[in-house]
Amino acid sequence: LAAIVSGQAEQEFDLGWNINTRGSWGLFEAIRSQGDSYCPRVVFTSSIAVFGSPFPDLIPDDFFTTPLTSYGAQKAISELLLADYSRKGMVDGISIRLPTICVRPGKPNLAASGFFSGIIREPLNGQEAILPVDTDVRHWHATPRSAAGFLIHAAELDTSKLNNRITLNMPGLSVTVQEQIEALGRVAGNDVVKLIKHQPDPVIKKIVSGWARNFSTKRSLDLGFKAETTFDEIIQIYIEDDLKK
């Protein structure tokens, strides 16, 4: 998983490259230095940030990567590095492009996508949440529970089934911010929804405007990866797994 997330990688250029890209390359080189007899499975957690607009309504695995953030570029480069080390037989690699993970537990981090979780997590904990974008913004989500499942399944998957195309879009759910808010109202009531305060942030809006919104995940679904199908379910999973723990 990324050590330097999207918003911070954009603000601290050198730090993002040193940790996210050089860190990945350093791991691959450390494995290679062990010799030909050592070829471990490496599951790389990539991101939908490798894609940038313009893009089709449904983005397939093989759509070209045009990241519009430093974080996305760092992830795309690491995907290519892993593919080459895998091609050379130095590692047995698979890259999984995670949706934005929602609802993230704990305190907010510096990810530009953090508000997608914040507008659910904070109100459910009785706290005010700031919404920095318009409610018609559409995005791609999956829960921490699904992300853990993706990683375990990727670690166990027979990679010969990938036919050397080792990068996969993970399943997820495409919803607007408005649909998130409506789901929160159904699950927790309108008093909770009233804790969301709209406060536009032009920096966040610019970053989010270049992000992908929906994906074709037939390959990953056919390979047995699974995710949620409604945002109500995403909220319920947060309540079950993380609320006030």
Residue map of PLM features:
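Amphipathic terminal alpha-helices
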Residues: 198-200, 210-222, 229-245
